[in-house]
Amino acid sequence: MHILTTTSASLDDLAEPVDLRQTPADVVALSFTDSDLSGLAAAWKADAERLPSMRLAALRDLRHPMSVDLWIDSVARHAKVILVRILGGYDWWRYGCDQLAAVARERGIKLALLPGESHDEDLRLIEGSTLPRAELDALLGYFREGGPANMTALVKRLARLAGSDTAVAEPVRVPKAGYYQPGHGVVPLPLEGRVRPQAGGGVLRDTRRHPEERPQEETLSPVV
């Protein structure tokens, strides 16, 4: 009988080294999600002339340790502010977190390591960051609410951290459900009192018309 030799490898081990060839910037942001990066890019481009320079990168391109080292040497170590949002938390980008934490402390960089899941708390990310806990919570709040207005406010807050005199706005709550009314914008759809539990499980919707409701023939769509 022959015993087969087996080996295991993580995604980081299987990834190929990549040199992103980015140039340095005052503000740097990394994320696993395209929606984060596209939202930040749009917000920065809308007011680029008055904002500090910014670089964005996808964490999926920085999975190999050599890729991380190259990027830190060419970009991160020259930044004033670095924001990283990690889907899956510390364990999904352990090497990058550790290296950035060391460089940030060595060079006095403001580092925010945030969880990708907005309601989760990862103490290892908090400990690796150089910003106060209150500032980390505030930065995460923009992602938690989402939307163009909050991405714009987030970019301005990062600019302020980088030394700009840009005015800072707190995260704005975005309705979890609603509909778009031409000429008025997004109209929230109140959820309180609209459903009630039934015996044996499930819920029963309150079908009574409310003043803010649209006629039944018009379709209500969730706010994205």
Regions found by a protein language model. Name each.
Residues M1-R194, R205-T207, P215-V224:
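An N-terminal assembly and electron-transfer interface module characteristic of large anaerobic redox
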